[in-house]
């Protein structure tokens, strides 16, 4: 994570690429495949640090997961809903909040078994009470530092009771943890969200045979009933639109660029980036649309756009593009007028405080950004000069700064550029490919 990358500004992007498998779906394929009956074969898995942390934890829970080799399919032998073993050691989730939060839900319902979850220094400072509190309403026994809000987290598996839970924030991780707990809870568990969040868990549980339904206004009420079994499936994981977004924005704002990104997941709970690109006036088209295992996919062709318009991101669209805010902040610097990010407090408790970090680092290039409690105000039509910037160990910051460097006059340095490997291990190779 400590390596340095140098990037020469003024370089156009040309070519076609495939982005790595979707990180969210990779986590869920491992977890749901592990508690299904029979075998689950996974293709297109994201071979990066976070999903590999999930695989390592599941192995310690007794799941037979082979060594995962990049770009090769593999098969999990599922243990069934109550077949996980009490581990002999602490489960280390690395830097992955998804791993920790989803496992909290899964393990809280493993009656009579005890577990301890920890992570790296960054993860152990991220809020976990947002998962622990709703699980406690179901009868879960979860404790941790700062009144259960921070890891290490201790879980005493219990027989949980289904209930109706309203989540204070639209979070796919919180929702997914409750649904996974609901698989082993008595009766019916209902999750009501304030806004729709990404729905990969619901789609995959349904594909595996769970009794799950989507109800209410805008699909914000998800109901799961226990009592059945999950049956192993063959899962083909599409490319991650959050990873594709770096190239989509880069091709839009770097002069004379044209990029085709193939086989990208187009789940409607994840395509907020396309809505913003429409508002900006970006020049793109979606090709080769299809649906695989309930997930819509397609290829996205993007060409440079002139006179991009400023935009505002706020409200219900935030959950659909929460991971794209860093690269959209870069885009805003090159739009006409003033753009604004609102209602984005969630970014302050990601791998870093992404609002603060993006403002601090882009200002080094000459960006005019004002930080607010819940977002950013970005003045457009910036003229970037070269700078030495730092990912501050955040993968999405590292990649966003790389794209920003292409717009800077001169050669820029990115410190701790290796952070990109958390979600996109081949990012730097792809950047070299598209710029040469």
UniProtKB/Swiss-Prot annotation:
Reactions listed under catalytic activity: 3-phosphoshikimate + phosphoenolpyruvate = 5-O-(1-carboxyvinyl)-3-phosphoshikimate + phosphate
Gene Ontology annotations for the cellular component aspect, listed alphabetically: cytoplasm
Pfam families reported in the protein's UniProt record: EPSP_synthase
Keyword vocabulary terms for this entry: Amino-acid biosynthesis, Aromatic amino acid biosynthesis, Cytoplasm, Transferase
Protein name: 3-phosphoshikimate 1-carboxyvinyltransferase
Major localization listed first in the record, in broad terms: cytoplasm
Description of how the protein assembles with itself and partners: Monomer.
GO molecular-function terms, A-Z: 3-phosphoshikimate 1-carboxyvinyltransferase activity
Residue positions of the active site: 323 (proton acceptor)
Top-rank EC class of the record's enzyme: transferase
Organism whose genome encodes this protein: Prochlorococcus marinus (strain MIT 9215)
């Amino acid at each position: 994570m400590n390596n340095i990358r140098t990037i020469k500004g003024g370089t156009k992007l040309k070519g076609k690429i495939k982005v790595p498998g979707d990180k969210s779906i990779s986590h869920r394929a491992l977890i749901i495949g592990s508690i299904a009956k029979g075998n689950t074969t996974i293709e297109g898995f994201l071979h990066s640090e976070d999903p590999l942390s999930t695989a390592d934890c599941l192995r310690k829970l007794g799941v037979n997961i082979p060594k995962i080799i990049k770009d090769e399919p593999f098969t999990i032998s599922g243990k069934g809903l109550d077949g996980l073993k009490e581990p002999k050691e602490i489960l280390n989730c690395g830097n992955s909040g998804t791993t920790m939060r989803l496992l909290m839900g899964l393990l809280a319902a493993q009656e009579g078994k005890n577990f301890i979850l920890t992570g790296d220094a960054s993860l152990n400072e991220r809020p976990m009470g947002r998962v622990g509190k709703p699980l406690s309403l179901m009868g879960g026994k979860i404790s941790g530092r700062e009144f259960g809000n921070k890891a290490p987290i201790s879980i005493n598996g219990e027989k949980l009771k289904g209930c109706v839970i309203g989540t204070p924030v639209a979070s796919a991780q919180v929702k997914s943890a409750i649904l996974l707990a609901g698989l082993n809870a008595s009766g019916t568990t209902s999750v009501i969200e304030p806004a729709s969040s990404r729905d990969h868990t619901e789609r995959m549980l349904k594909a595996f045979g769970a009794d799950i339904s989507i109800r209410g206004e805008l699909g914000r009420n998800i109901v799961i009933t226990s009592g059945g079994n999950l049956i192993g499936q063959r899962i083909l994981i599409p490319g991650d639109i959050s990873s594709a977004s770096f190239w989509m924005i880069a091709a839009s704002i770097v002069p004379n660029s044209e990029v085709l990104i193939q086989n990208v997941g187009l789940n409607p709970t994840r395509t907020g980036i396309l809505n913003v690109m429409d508002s900006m006036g970006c020049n793109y088209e979606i090709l080769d649309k299809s649906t695989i295992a309930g997930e819509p996919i397609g290829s996205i062709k993007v060409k440079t756009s002139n006179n991009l318009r400023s935009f505002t991101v706020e409200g219900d669209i935030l959950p659909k593009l929460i991971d794209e805010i860093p690269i959209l902040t870069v885009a805003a610097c090159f739009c006409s007028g003033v753009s604004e990010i609102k209602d984005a407090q969630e970014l302050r408790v990601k791998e870093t405080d992404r609002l603060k970090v993006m403002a601090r680092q882009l200002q080094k290039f000459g960006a005019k950004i004002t930080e607010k409690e819940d977002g950013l105000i970005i003045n457009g039509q910036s003229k970037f000069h070269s700078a030495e910037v730092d990912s501050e160990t955040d993968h999405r910051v590292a990649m966003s700064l790389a794209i920003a460097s292409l717009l800077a006059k001169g050669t820029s340095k990115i410190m701790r550029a290796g952070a990109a490997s958390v979600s996109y291990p081949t990012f730097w190779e792809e950047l070299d490919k598209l710029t040469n």
